């Protein structure tokens, strides 16, 4: 039966007479059937990747590509006068993640299935995700981001598990979402929910009764933690995830012959950041119910579990007040106390304790003590963990520490989102890179081929025009496609330093007003959400939106400079932005970004990186060579030294540098105050002068010089720019998540064995 016949059988009428919605549902059903055919029996050890987030993006096209059906589907629809891209618009994007943590988890699931490794995800079925972002009068507003429909990819099962929270029993319902690999197997993303969730309790944006646990528990990812009820709700969420997940793991392992004593021969559990940390005491508790003594249970769990650290930011290393855990998970506290006592027999260093003198429970400490592996996610990040942030643990357990540099799935971030570049690459080097990303290096043979460089430029031009069309259609913004597309799209956080980009744009505004024109017109595009309670982050958004209005109203400046801020940035938007990018902004304060994966996606699609020596930027620089990347700013050692010395005083930089002072003072100048809100702008102005915790000002001048150099190279040396782009594409192979997952399996998981 051909594809057209399959679709007609499901719709019951000619394709030309079907709506896009009807065709979407038919395609969804075909994908489900074909995915089921690729499910393979599990032998040996199986991975359970537990994560609070899975930012999976829309699934239709990705699944069609991985199943080898994309071209067939597109042609069958085109023959009936239908456009697959229109049908893709019908699909809601799953609201299951927010930033890099969740996107990494999604890439890892793709690579596990592609490499034919048995590995499932475990998480929660959020109804509204983080939030839907909109801008009103230059201010971020948050609303629910619904995505669940009667025909969701996540299928309801009859499997339930009891979960005890604050002395009350809840019933966790399992939903299963098929994860297809590229020419590989089908694995599963297991998502848990409660049948009692009530979406109607949400009001006034994203406000809801945080104490109505039976109604609210899975409504939102990362509920607002600015009050105690919100913080406790996060503990409730985390325990629901790990308790239901642990019961699933034990049930599936037992069904395959596990007697619980040999759990580590059947299951490998990866704890993705600290949100799932309670799986350690929960598994010990459940094994105790199976008759296994505490000491043996600890050994079993330690051998089964591994931990990935994603941050050196103290605020992100979760420390829960003991009172919260006593209230929400009293059944775990005796176990956590025993684990703390056991850890104290291994070291007298109080700073490595699980329960500290202030009665806070350190989740990362529990992870490191009672898993067999702790990994960082980029070479620099891992070295900082070993030598600085987690040095005491490294001295205690040197054998546990290892690095696994993050990666991205090339199926979504090249084949799906940049079909023009994919076709050009296949024409030049064949299609082997689809499965073996290292084959991209073959492109280096064309580094001096003007015809090939010209084709790559034509691809970029077409992608920029496609983005311009999308921006006009979805954001009501018109952009100059001949300008440099300079993009910073990532979570809004001071350490990622969108405020540094802001100050550059103000500086450039002044330069243009003074007649010093840039080498090329610049369109600066931002995509970012700020956490609802993160005031300064929301002020940065307001400042950028206000500056965009000031520039747009100035005909002298707007010919050369434009700011675009994407509303509700998500995976779908990223798939539009990344192929069109010329200059990729990766400007976090050195030592603060664990890895980053946006840098890899932009590089793969032929953008050049403007960045600090932070996270995976270091390894990108090593791969492409310093002549093919724009590096600036302090080193991580210099930054750490400043923090240790405590001698950074932002006001001294403000007073001592006229350009810095002019840019900061513009925030509260006449033009900005006329277009924006004094409260937000003044608060950001004062923050930069009196605090600037992430050292924006010391890097400002170096940033201006390197960014101006990039614009000059783009305008004055187009052939050199094109060559740099080609080298970046060719050297991106190392950053495939297939490589990352193969290393995890080789060193930590040993799946299927």
Residue ranges and their predicted role:
Residues 1-753:
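A conserved ligand/cofactor-binding region detector
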């Amino acid at each position: 039966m051909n594809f057209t016949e399959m679709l007609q059988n499901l719709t019951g009428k000619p394709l030309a007479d079907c709506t896009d919605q009807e065709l979407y549902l038919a395609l969804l059903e075909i994908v489900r059937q074909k995915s089921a055919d690729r499910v393979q029996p599990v032998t040996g050890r199986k991975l359970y990747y537990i994560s609070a987030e899975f930012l999976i993006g829309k699934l239709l096209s990705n699944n069609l590509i991985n199943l080898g059906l994309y071209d067939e589907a597109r042609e069958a629809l085109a023959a009936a006068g239908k456009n697959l891209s229109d049908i893709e618009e019908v699909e809601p994007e799953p609201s299951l993640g927010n930033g890099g943590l969740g996107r990494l988890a999604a890439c890892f699931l793709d690579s596990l299935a592609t490499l034919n490794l048995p590995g499932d995800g475990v998480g929660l079925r959020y109804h509204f995700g983080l939030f839907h972002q909109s801008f009103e009068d230059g201010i971020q507003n948050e609303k629910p981001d619904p995505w669940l429909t009667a025909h969701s990819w996540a299928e309801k099962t009859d499997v339930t598990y009891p979960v005890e929270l604050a002395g009350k029993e809840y019933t966790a319902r399992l939903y299963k979402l098929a994860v297809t690999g590229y020419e590989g197997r089908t694995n599963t993303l297991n998502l848990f929910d409660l049948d009692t969730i009530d979406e109607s309790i949400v009001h006034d944006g994203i406000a809801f009764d945080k104490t109505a646990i039976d109604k609210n528990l899975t409504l939102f990812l990362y509920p607002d933690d600015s009050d105690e009820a919100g913080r406790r709700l996060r503990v409730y969420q985390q325990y629901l995830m790990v308790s239901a997940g642990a019961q699933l793991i034990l049930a599936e392992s037992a069904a395959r012959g596990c007697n619980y004593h040999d759990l580590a021969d059947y299951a490998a559990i990866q704890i993705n950041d600290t949100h799932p940390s309670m799986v350690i005491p929960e598994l010990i508790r459940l094994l105790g119910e199976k008759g296994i003594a505490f000491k043996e249970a600890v050994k079993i769990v330690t051998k089964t579990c591994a931990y990935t650290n994603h941050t050196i930011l103290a605020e992100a290393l979760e420390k829960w007040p003991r009172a919260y855990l006593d209230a929400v998970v009293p059944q775990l506290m005796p176990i956590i106390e025993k684990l703390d006592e056991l850890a104290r027999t291994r070291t007298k260093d109080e700073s490595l304790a699980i329960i500290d003198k202030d009665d806070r429970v350190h989740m990362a400490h529990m992870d490191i003590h009672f898993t067999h592996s702790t990994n960082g996610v980029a070479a620099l990040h891992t070295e900082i963990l070993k030598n600085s942030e987690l040095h005491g643990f490294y001295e205690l357990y040197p054998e546990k520490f290892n690095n696994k540099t993050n990666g991205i799935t090339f199926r979504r971030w090249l084949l799906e989102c940049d079909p023009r570049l994919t076709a050009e690459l296949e024409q030049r080097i064949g299609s082997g890179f689809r499965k073996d990303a290292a084959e991209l290096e073959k492109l280096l043979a064309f580094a001096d081929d003007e015809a090939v460089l010209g084709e790559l430029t034509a691809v970029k031009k077409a992608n920029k025009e496609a983005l311009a069309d999308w921006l006009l259609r979805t954001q009501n913004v018109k952009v100059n496609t001949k300008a440099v597309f300079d993009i910073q799209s990532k979570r809004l956080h001071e350490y990622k330093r969108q405020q540094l980009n802001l100050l550059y744009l103000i500086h450039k505004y002044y330069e243009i007003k003074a007649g010093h024109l840039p080498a090329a017109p610049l369109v600066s595009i931002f995509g970012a959400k700020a956490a609802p309670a993160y005031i300064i982050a929301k002020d940065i958004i307001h400042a950028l939106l206000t500056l965009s209005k000031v520039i747009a109203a100035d005909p002298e400046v707007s010919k050369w400079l434009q700011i675009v801020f994407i509303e509700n940035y998500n995976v779908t938007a990223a798939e539009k932005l990344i192929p069109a990018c010329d200059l990729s902004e990766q400007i976090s304060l050195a030592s603060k970004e664990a890895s980053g994966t946006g840098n890899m996606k932009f590089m793969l699609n032929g953008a050049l990186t403007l960045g600090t020596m932070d996270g995976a930027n270091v390894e990108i620089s090593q791969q492409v060579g310093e002549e093919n990347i724009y590096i600036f700013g302090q080193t991580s050692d210099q930054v750490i030294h400043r923090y240790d010395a405590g001698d950074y005083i932002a006001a001294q930089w403000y007073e001592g540098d006229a350009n810095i002072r002019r840019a900061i003072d513009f925030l509260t100048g006449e033009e900005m105050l006329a277009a924006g809100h004094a409260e937000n702008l003044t608060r950001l102005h004062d923050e930069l002068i009196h605090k600037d915790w992430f050292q924006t000002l010391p890097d400002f001048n170096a940033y201006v010089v390197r960014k101006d150099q990039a614009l000059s190279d783009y305008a004055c040396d187009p052939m050199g720019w094109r060559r740099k782009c080609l080298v970046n594409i060719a050297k991106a192979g190392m950053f495939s998540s297939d490589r990352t997952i193969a290393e995890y399996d080789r060193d930590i998981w040993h799946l299927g064995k």
